[in-house]
């Protein structure tokens, strides 16, 4: 169960767009995220696998980490690594992660918090489970999303936002059947706390068993829904969906999900497409091959930062 919950009867309501005659988005595609490993071997689902980049724009990459109940000494993280040219959005649904970067940032991401890092011109950072989770094991569930930056912003100064759970906008659908945790962007005039370089909306929704959730959505944005857990249907034609499915919607003013016999947990994404060339390799997302090569050269020369002398390291026991 997500760490952040609320009584939907007490929350601000999102208007049902059907009452306003909104055009509902049909389903364009449904894909299944394959399982793999990241960093030093922690399990992930590659949420965007097999989806055309034009359907994802301005999003680049997304991994679901867990949900997993780790045995002792099973948790793994990632050691220090560079990024340039995009933003990483790390959302910890349950559990705890430690992080640190070469610009003096660092801290703990836990139980509903989001770490929003704008890599911009370049940064080194590390994300790893704390010693207590490694030694004792325990529940861990999270997501990491990569958001592209337009060419004019790729070399901006790196920055970091720590979005604690109490900052997230908690909303309910008109019938109170769904909880929406608005992390960034806007839904029906309500705003999330995340400051974005690219116009986007990011939210985590819980649709209660048997309930239908229809959300208004910016018609200038694409619309993606990733199933974190549960099963149900998507769109006006009730396409079946389950854990690991990514739903891409066509154009329109709203979209719909309906939960099955258990709660349907959804990570909802949409943004204004950048529509610029993308040159990506490993931790760098630029516009040209020459810019990619420059990023590698700058990293090798230490121009993306250095690991602090007392820098965080993965705990291996």
PLM feature spans:
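Jelly-roll (double-stranded beta-helix
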Residues: 1-317
């Amino acid at each position: 169960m997500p760490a952040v919950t609320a009584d939907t009867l007490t929350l601000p309501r999102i208007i049902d767009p059907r009452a306003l005659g909104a055009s509902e988005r049909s389903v364009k595609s449904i894909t299944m995220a394959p399982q793999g490993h990241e960093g030093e071997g922690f399990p992930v689902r590659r949420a965007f696998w097999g989806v055309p980049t034009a359907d994802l724009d301005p999003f680049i990459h997304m991994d679901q980490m867990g949900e997993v109940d780790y045995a002792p000494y099973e948790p793994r993280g990632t050691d220090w690594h560079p990024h340039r040219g995009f933003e990483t959005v790390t959302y910890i649904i349950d559990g705890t992660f430690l992080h640190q970067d070469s610009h003096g940032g660092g801290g703990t991401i836990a139980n509903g918090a989001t770490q929003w890092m704008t890599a911009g011109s370049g940064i080194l950072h590390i994300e790893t489970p704390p010693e207590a989770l490694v030694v004792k094991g325990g529940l861990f569930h999270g997501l990491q999303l990569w958001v592209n930056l337009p060419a004019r912003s790729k070399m901006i100064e790196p920055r970091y936002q720590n979005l604690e759970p109490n900052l997230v906008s908690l909303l309910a659908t008109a019938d109170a059947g769904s909880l929406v945790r608005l992390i960034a962007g806007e839904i029906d005039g309500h705003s999330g706390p995340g400051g974005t370089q690219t116009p986007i909306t990011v939210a985590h929704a819980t649709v209660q068993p048997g309930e239908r959730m229809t959300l208004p959505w910016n018609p200038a944005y694409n619309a993606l829904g990733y199933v974190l857990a549960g099963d149900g249907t998507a769109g006006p034609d009730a396409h079946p969906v389950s854990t690991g499915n990514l739903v891409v919607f066509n154009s329109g003013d709203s979209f719909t999900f309906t939960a099955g016999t258990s709660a349907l947990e959804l990570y909802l994404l949409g943004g204004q497409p950048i529509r610029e060339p993308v040159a990506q390799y490993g931790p760098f997302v630029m516009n040209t091959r020459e810019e990619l090569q420059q990023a590698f050269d700058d990293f090798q020369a230490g121009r993306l930062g250095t690991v602090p002398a007392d820098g965080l390291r993965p705990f291996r026991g």
